[in-house]
Amino acid sequence: MYKYTLIIFILSNLYAASPSPVFGENGMVVSSNINASKVGISILKKGGNAIDAAVAVGFALAVTDPGNTGLGGGGFMVSVTSEGEIFTQDHREKAPANSKQNMFLDENNNVVEGQSLHSRSSSGVPGTVDGLINAWTDYGSGNIGLHQLLTPAIKLAEKGYELSHTQANELNYFK
């Protein structure tokens, strides 16, 4: 009996500690950084759509949360337009243009130790910037220019922003 009471007590405390759901009527922006989320909200208020906001948030996160996002990586986008069109975009990194199928093999078709990890050719070409701009070009509202999407991230980079407790701890760890 006490075993089940303890389990119910633990589960009820976990549920009680969960944040309450939040609902929005005209749009909502959620990201890993409040500054980036505010950028997305401002884009929506200026007449942008969800893609405009997502692109602006993506660039802002490259500044405010570079450990989890960044211009040197890639990603995917899965979305639904206001007309109900479902689309996906692949923004992942790509192999360099001069890549060849056997570029990490020697003349005997044996793997060259370390070359696939520690050579210029082993690095992928980032896809984030191109992907975000393509998403905006293909599915943006047309009401917001690229300059308006990039300016908030540039301002965050130039003027700075308050770090979260977690970010401050991470930076202090590497002091």
What are these regions (language model features)?
Residues 4-12:
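Sec-dependent N-terminal signal peptides
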Residues 17-38, 50-175:
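Noncatalytic scaffold domains of N-terminal-nucleophile
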